[in-house]
UniProtKB/Swiss-Prot annotation:
Pfam families hit by this protein: Pkinase
UniProt keyword list: Cell cycle, Cytoplasm, Nucleus, Phosphoprotein
Name of the featured protein: STE20-related kinase adapter protein alpha
Chain's role: Pseudokinase which, in complex with CAB39/MO25 (CAB39/MO25alpha or CAB39L/MO25beta), binds to and activates STK11/LKB1. Adopts a closed conformation typical of active protein kinases and binds STK11/LKB1 as a pseudosubstrate, promoting conformational change of STK11/LKB1 in an active conformation.
Gene3D superfamilies, alphabetized: Phosphorylase Kinase, domain 1, Transferase(Phosphotransferase) domain 1
Length: 431
């Protein structure tokens, strides 16, 4: 029994902000903080998020006490059913938040170690495009992780419920710009993210883009020295197989580095533009072989799909594999109430195609860094801040902001709220 009781205590010491932020940063175990005023700027619109948050802004003075949070509707499960995700209200301010409660008693030692790594980076990272943990603490034998509620959900939620054939290019540019800013910071801190995908891109009510999935981050710092490559294979990697780079999947002595995240950005770009991830529904072994043999996904539009396929009968369309040479049965969306049109009868800019091609280079050394990609011509179309433009570009989608009737003692208004929340893949947010 003492072995089980020690698990919450084992996590508790990692939750201490002083232990993680001050102690470990002083020991220089996690690389150097990127200098705020010496970093190269991109264009004016993209330079807004270079400066990190202040610690006060990140934590938002949320108290680490269970009694300060009124747990409302359960909106998800996860982490092998050991995690319950609640919509909650922070009592001192009335703000609605998301609370992850993880049963530490039932966690294996491997899971506890996994959670420790997540808490490490959540306390260490401090950037406007990385989802902040508002509070982390132990309540009884549960680990509570409090984050802001993301009213637009994840980018995957958006393409699954509203943009089934993909988003428009400008919206994707805003989203990927936020992702690359976060990755640039993460890479300078000496980490590889290893789980960049649409479900780990969260969008707040005011249109701000956040990268989550910190649980999969891997440090490239060993014994105070930054390693050229790492060899660790991601845990639970079957869920992120379509996004993983060939060099990660090879698991050979050459290893991989931060450029593996750039490949994942390219796959995510295809996911957002095509409405589904490349290699979707492929068996794992086939996906592995396709990647190792050099198969490169692409954006699906008039420049990559033969003209005869764009005009063929509505019963055929591009396959769920996300590769332009595969066909399967599908029903294209009707156009203007007339005859159905091909969903990919559109044309993305040459800059967008080139951006994706650069990200998906088979040789990782040929891929640009995150900081280089932020200066790519693809982002020249951005003229405003994401918080100003993205909500307009996501119309007719409206953020979930009406929480009336969601209190646990008042069931009259819960049904509509839960119906909306169930459309969000909260399990995949991973915060």
């Amino acid at each position: 029994m003492s072995f089980l009781v020690s698990k919450p205590e084992r996590i508790r010491r990692w939750v201490s902000e002083k232990f993680i932020v001050e102690g470990l940063r002083d020991l220089e175990l996690f690389g150097e903080q990127p200098p705020g005023d010496t970093r190269r700027k991109t264009n004016d619109a993209s330079s807004e998020s270079i400066a990190p948050f202040s610690k006060q802004e990140v934590m938002g003075s949320f108290l680490p006490e269970g009694g300060c949070y009124e747990l409302l509707t359960v909106i998800g499960k996860g982490f092998e059913d050991l995690m319950t995700v609640n919509l909650a209200r922070y009592k001192p301010t009335g703000e609605y938040v998301t609370v992850r409660r993880i049963n530490l008693e039932a966690c294996s030692n491997e899971m506890v170690t996994f959670l420790q790594g997540e808490l490490h980076v959540s306390k260490l990272f401090n950037h406007p495009n990385i989802v902040p943990y508002r509070a982390t603490f132990i309540a009884d034998n549960e680990l509570w992780v409090v984050t802001s509620f993301m009213a637009y959900g994840s980018a995957k939620d958006l393409i699954c419920t509203h943009f089934m054939d993909g988003m428009n290019e400008l919206a994707i540019a805003y989203i990927l710009q936020g992702v690359l800013k976060a990755l640039d910071y993460i890479h300078h801190m000496g980490y590889v993210h290893r789980s960049v995908k649409a479900s780990h891109i969260l969008i707040s009510v005011d249109g701000k883009v956040y990268l989550s999935g910190l649980r999969s981050n891997l440090s490239m710092i060993s014994h105070g020295q930054r390693q050229r490559v790492v060899h660790d294979f991601p845990k639970y990697s079957i869920k992120v197989l379509p996004w993983l780079s060939p060099e990660v999947l090879q698991q050979n002595l050459q290893g991989y580095d931060a450029k593996s995240d750039i490949y994942s950005v390219g796959i995510t770009a295809c996911e957002l533009a095509n409405g589904h991830v490349p290699f979707k529904d492929m068996p794992a072994t086939q996906t592995l072989l396709e990647k190792l043999n050099g198969t490169v996904p692409c954006l699906l539009d008039t420049s990559t799909i033969p003209a005869e396929e764009l005009t063929m009968s509505p019963s055929r369309s591009v396959a769920n594999s996300g590769l332009s040479d595969s066909l399967t049965t599908s029903t294209p969306r009707p156009s203007n109430g007339d005859s159905p049109s091909h969903p990919y009868h559109r044309t993305f800019s040459p800059h967008f195609h080139h951006f994706v091609e650069q990200c998906l280079q088979r040789n990782p050394d040929a891929r640009p860094s995150a900081s280089t990609l932020l200066n790519h011509s693809f982002f020249k179309q951005i003229k405003r801040r994401a918080s100003e433009a993205l909500p307009e570009l996501l119309r007719p989608v409206t953020p979930i902001t009406n929480f009336e009737g969601s209190q646990s003692q008042d069931h009259s208004g819960i049904f509509g709220l839960v119906t909306n929340l169930e459309e969000l893949e909260v399990d995949d947010w991973e915060f």
